[in-house]
A protein has these predicted regions:
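Acidic-basic catalytic patches of nuclease active cores, encompassing PD-(D/E)XK
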Residues: 2-47
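Domain-level recognition of nuclease-like catalytic cores that cleave nucleotide substrates
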Residues: 104-135
Length: 135
C-alpha cells in the first residue's frame, strides 16, 4: 500500500517537529506511521518499547492480530530503500523482542504479525509504504 501526501501537509508536520528539540528523522517517520495507523483505526498499545535487547517501534492491534511494526525512514533519493535496511539480523531481533513483549505482558495464544512501514521523505512530500506480514 502506498500513500502520497502533498507539500502543504508535510510543511505543517515539519514545522511542528522543528519546534521540538533534537527530533531525528526516525522520530519523524514514527510520528507519520503512528498517525497513519490511527487513521486506519488501529489500537496502538505501545510505542518505542525497549529492553536491553533492543526496541520495538510500534505495537498495535489490527482486529484480533497483535502487530509488531518496524518503521524505517530515509531521505530520498537514496541508494538503498528503507525496505532493504531490514536484514536477517534485524528480523531475528524483532522476533526475540516480540516474544519478550508477549511473555512480559502475558499475551498468549494471540495471532501475531510483523509489519513494515517504509517512509521516504523529500523536501516537499513523503511516500509511505505499508507491508503487512513482511516476515
Amino acid at each position: 500500500m502506498e500513500v502520497r501526501i502533498r507539500k502543504g501537509r508535510v510543511s505543517r508536520v515539519r514545522a511542528w517537529l522543528a519546534t521540538r528539540k533534537g527530533v531525528r528523522l526516525g522520530d519523524f517517520g514514527e510520528w507519520i506511521a503512528l498517525k497513519y495507523l490511527l487513521f486506519r483505526r488501529w489500537d496502538i498499545i505501545a510505542r518505542n518499547w525497549r529492553t536491553r535487547q533492543g526496541e520495538l517501534d510500534l505495537i498495535a492491534y489490527d482486529g484480533p492480530d497483535l502487530v509488531f511494526i518496524e518503521v524505517r525512514t530515509r531521505h530520498a533519493p537514496t541508494q538503498f530503500s528503507p525496505e532493504k535496511s531490514v536484514d536477517g539480523k534485524k528480523r531475528d531481533q524483532l522476533e526475540r523482542l516480540a516474544y519478550s513483549f508477549m511473555e512480559r505482558h502475558e499475551l498468549y495464544d494471540l495471532p501475531i504479525r510483523f509489519d513494515l512501514i517504509a517512509i521516504e521523505t523529500s523536501a516537499r512530500d513523503y511516500c509511505l509504504r505499508h507491508y503487512s506480514g513482511f516476515m
